[in-house]
């Protein structure tokens, strides 16, 4: 254990989960001395729930984290034992990379990467309090042994540990997750800041012994033959690849669950927190979708050398004996042994409207929050917030400009804006449908959107910079060659490409945007591109496919950026004549940072925005005269 009675760092990150590790790495990459404080060193990078990374919307976040040199994507590629590109039959904008991960490899590789990161120390201990310079300025942390660590900024990533309570049937026990104690004293300290707090819940299914599953009678789901990896630096899979199994609940399963609903912690009245809408418990599915006779279950091995299987789709808070009964009513699981019961966990969260776009608390300077404490669910959402908080905490220490991600340049920006503008009434999960500019926010172009920003911030390694420059040079050369020649309809027809014989000349990029035209189809017309590597061909094809749509979208993006330029001072008064009391209250609670953010508050009207704009312009003119 790294331990000193008194020490000083630039940034301290509390918690070694997905938000904490990403925050610590981001801060350290910025060149500031960073400490990652966690209960146990070997708990860094633990996958508390499902053994998977990515998915629809989530995969976009992982790619964006990687584009800024974050660690989640690289570690997921090392630990991935099955890779699948979701929505493969749809357009690239909504396709989502996903990987089944080996829990053990993921944890070991995340710990290895964290130990190897320069400017970063790992400290074991429980944080019980903050060091305060004033009632509204954090200056470090206090551990349970009363040792102190001073810091310019603190990033809190407590996950489900704040006043965490585990529920199995009518039995409840304190815990941050199964086998770990909760954080009680720190939760009490947060209450003293008079922050808007609430309770949320999440759940996990029983873990099964794969040796007791009848795999032979189940459908098999293999991974993709040509895996789509997360990191722009990865080239191949590292771990052995496996298949998952598929089974379904049935009427007997549903009958067992219905007969025991009152024994469920959720339906028995033991849980007050709201659970995730898009990851409901099996009890919730049976009640909400009463007309369905079966629900799909994915049997996901937790590792290549681990017999544990994660049955994705049957999370529960029913008593353990009922769990065994309903599991064994399912085809292929008739003799399955339950290694660990499923459970629900309830925990404190902070209303994210109390945060700024940097994820620093509005009313407590130097304290940043990231992950489930902000009302989100999912490893990827947590890691993306950790990245934002870590970068901004380091920038605060370096006295650099705040780092704000916009809705027009990243899913990270969409998520942060959603959280701090509208708050949450249930655990927030990322989907591609949340992004209005999703045609340009594709998983495949995350590096083109964000890696240059990483250059400017100083959080990108030379290896990544060199690889990105090489890739962009190749893309630029290829596009230049394709646009250098105008082709007649006759030339295209002679090359086997069907187009309207309208006399209009088109360049190679225009032709690539046609349906069913592949890069190989235009090579007879551009023989100098025959040696273009596959990844560059695919990227240029995707870029050409969306070029016209994105050009039309630019007007909307320009309008959004114009409104984002109207910054709202922290002490701005909403006592504006003509502004309704309801909107005043919502604006006071959310305290938007720009006119664009104010426009997205529920109930906002064009007339109210015009009143605010007039007041902001008047304020700006007054400041100009004063100076």
From Swiss-Prot:
A GO-annotated cellular component: cytosol
InterPro entries: FAD/NAD-bd_sf, GIDA_C_N, MnmG, MnmG-rel, MnmG-rel_CS, MnmG_C, MnmG_C_subdom, MnmG_C_subdom_sf
Example GO molecular function: flavin adenine dinucleotide binding
Cofactor: FAD
UniProt KW keywords: Cytoplasm, FAD, Flavoprotein, NAD, tRNA processing
Localization: Cytoplasm
Residue sites binding NAD(+) per the record: 275-289
Cytoplasm is among the record's keywords: yes
Stored PROSITE patterns: GIDA_1, GIDA_2
GO biological process, one term: tRNA methylation
Chief place of localization: cytoplasm
Binding positions for FAD per the UniProt entry: 15-20, 127, 183, 372
The keyword Ion transport is assigned to this record: no
Cross-referenced Gene3D superfamilies: FAD/NAD(P)-binding domain, GidA associated domain, C-terminal subdomain, tRNA uridine 5-carboxymethylaminomethyl modification enzyme MnmG/GidA
Pfam family, one: GIDA_C_1st
Self-association state and partner proteins as the record states: Homodimer. Heterotetramer of two MnmE and two MnmG subunits.
NCBIfam families recorded: mnmG_gidA
Family: Belongs to the MnmG family.
Cited function: NAD-binding protein involved in the addition of a carboxymethylaminomethyl (cmnm) group at the wobble position (U34) of certain tRNAs, forming tRNA-cmnm(5)s(2)U34.
PANTHER family recorded: GLUCOSE INHIBITED DIVISION PROTEIN A (PTHR11806), PROTEIN MTO1 HOMOLOG, MITOCHONDRIAL (PTHR11806:SF0)
Annotated HAMAP family: MnmG_GidA
Protein name per the record: tRNA uridine 5-carboxymethylaminomethyl modification enzyme MnmG
Organism (species): Ruegeria sp. (strain TM1040)
Gene assigned in the entry: mnmG
């Amino acid at each position: 254990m790294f331990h000193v009675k008194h020490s000083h760092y630039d940034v301290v990150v509390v918690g070694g989960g997905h938000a904490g590790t990403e925050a610590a790495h981001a801060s350290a990459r910025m060149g500031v001395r960073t400490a990652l404080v966690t209960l146990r060193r070997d708990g860094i990078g633990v996958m508390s729930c499902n053994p998977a990374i990515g998915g629809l919307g989530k995969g976009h976040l992982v790619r964006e984290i990687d584009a800024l040199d974050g660690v989640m994507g690289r570690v997921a590629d090392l630990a991935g034992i099955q890779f699948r590109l979701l929505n493969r039959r749809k357009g690239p904008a909504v396709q989502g990379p996903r990987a089944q991960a080996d829990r053990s490899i993921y944890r070991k590789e995340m710990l290895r990467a964290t130990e190897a990161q320069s400017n970063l120390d790992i400290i074991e201990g429980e944080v019980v309090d903050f060091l305060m310079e004033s009632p509204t300025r954090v200056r470090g942390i206090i551990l349970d042994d009363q040792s102190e660590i001073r810091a310019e900024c603190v990033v809190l990533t407590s996950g489900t540990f704040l006043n965490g309570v585990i529920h199995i049937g009518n039995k409840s026990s304190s815990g941050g997750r199964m086998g770990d104690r909760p954080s009680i004293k720190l939760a009490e300290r947060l209450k003293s800041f008079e922050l808007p707090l609430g309770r949320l819940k999440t759940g996990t299914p029983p873990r099964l012994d794969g040796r007791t599953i009848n795999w032979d009678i189940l459908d098999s789901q293999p991974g993709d033959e040509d895996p789509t990896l997360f990191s722009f630096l990865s080239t191949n899979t590292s771990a052995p690849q496996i298949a998952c199994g598929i089974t379904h609940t049935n009427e007997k399963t549903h009958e067992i669950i219905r007969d025991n609903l009152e024994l469920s912690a959720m339906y028995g009245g033991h849980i007050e927190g709201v659970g995730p809408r898009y990851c409901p418990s099996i009890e919730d599915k049976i009640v909400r979708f009463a007309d369905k006779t079966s629900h799909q279950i994915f049997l996901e091995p937790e590792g290549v050398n681990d017999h544990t299987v994660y049955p994705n789709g049957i999370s529960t808070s029913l008593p353990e004996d009922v769990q065994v009964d309903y599991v064994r009513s399912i085809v292929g699981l008739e003799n399955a042994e339950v290694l660990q019961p499923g459970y629900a966990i309830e925990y404190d969260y902070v209303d994210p409207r109390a945060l700024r776009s940097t994820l620093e608390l509005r009313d407590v300077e130097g304290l940043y929050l990231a992950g489930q404490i902000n009302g989100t669910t999912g490893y990827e959402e947590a890691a993306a917030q950790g990245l934002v908080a870590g970068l901004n905490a380091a920038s605060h220490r370096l006295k650099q400009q705040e780092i704000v991600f916009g809705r027009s340049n990243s899913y990270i920006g969409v998520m942060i804006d959603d959280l701090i503008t509208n708050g949450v009434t249930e655990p927030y999960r990322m989907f591609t449908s949340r992004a209005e500019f999703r045609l340009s926010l594709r998983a495949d172009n995350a590096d083109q959107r964000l890696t240059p920003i990483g250059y400017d911030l100083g959080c990108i390694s030379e290896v990544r910079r060199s690889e990105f420059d090489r890739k962009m040079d190749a893309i630029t050369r290829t596009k230049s060659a394709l646009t250098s020649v105008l082709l007649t309809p006759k030339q295209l027809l002679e090359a086997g490409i069907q187009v309207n014989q309208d006399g209009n000349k088109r360049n190679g990029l225009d032709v690539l945007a046609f349906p069913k035209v592949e890069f190989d189809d235009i090579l007879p017309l551009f023989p100098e591109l025959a040696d273009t590597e596959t990844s560059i061909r695919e990227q240029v094809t995707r870029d050409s496919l969306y070029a016209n749509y994105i050009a039309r979208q630019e007007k909307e993006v320009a309008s959004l950026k114009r409104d984002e330029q109207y910054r709202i001072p922290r002490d701005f008064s909403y006592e504006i004549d003509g502004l309704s009391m309801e909107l005043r209250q919502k604006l006071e609670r959310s305290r938007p940072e720009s006119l664009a953010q104010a426009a997205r508050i529920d109930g906002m009207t064009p007339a109210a925005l015009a009143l605010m704009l007039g007041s902001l312009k008047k304020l700006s003119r007054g400041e100009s005269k004063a100076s």
